[in-house]
Amino acid sequence: MTFTDLVIILFILALLAYAIYDQFIMPRRNGPVLLAIPLLRRSRVDGMIFVGLTAILIYNNITQHGTAITTWLLSVLALMGLYLFWIRTPKIIFKPRGFFFANVWIEYQRIKEMNLSEDGVLVMQLEQRRLLIRVRNIDDLEKIYKLLITTQ
């Protein structure tokens, strides 16, 4: 096994750890889930570039008669990229004391101001940053509003 294979394995393990944390660990942290809302995806261009470059590496490894283990590892890396960028749905998870947004825990008392833009984006102003929450279904904004009213 070459150094390149070890680096690819490290990347696969890092992506796998992130996927496991996002799907299984994060919903169980900080209390029960009160509401989980799917969000709109950001640009898929980054994921397309990652998977495309990985496909180029697979092609290059095959044409240069590279080792089979490297080809398989690159294929697993491409599949992890497909899962993370296209299959996995980003979501905001509301808990009794706060919520997870982009895998970051935010307490409710950090919210200084909330606004709703014309295009259906919920804007939450925190102490030093602004969160732009783009929900997939516009009706979910009412669910978020009702939840925030009952918890505050």
Swiss-Prot record:
It is a multi-pass membrane protein. InterPro entries: DUF986. GO terms for cellular component: plasma membrane. Its main location: membrane. The keyword Cell inner membrane applies. It comes from the Bacteria. It is found in: Cell inner membrane. Keywords: Cell inner membrane, Cell membrane, Membrane, Transmembrane, Transmembrane helix. The keyword Cell inner membrane applies. The chain crosses the membrane at residues 6-26, 45-65, 67-87. Belongs to the UPF0266 family. This is UPF0266 membrane protein KPN78578_23010. It comes from Klebsiella pneumoniae subsp. pneumoniae (strain ATCC 700721 / MGH 78578).
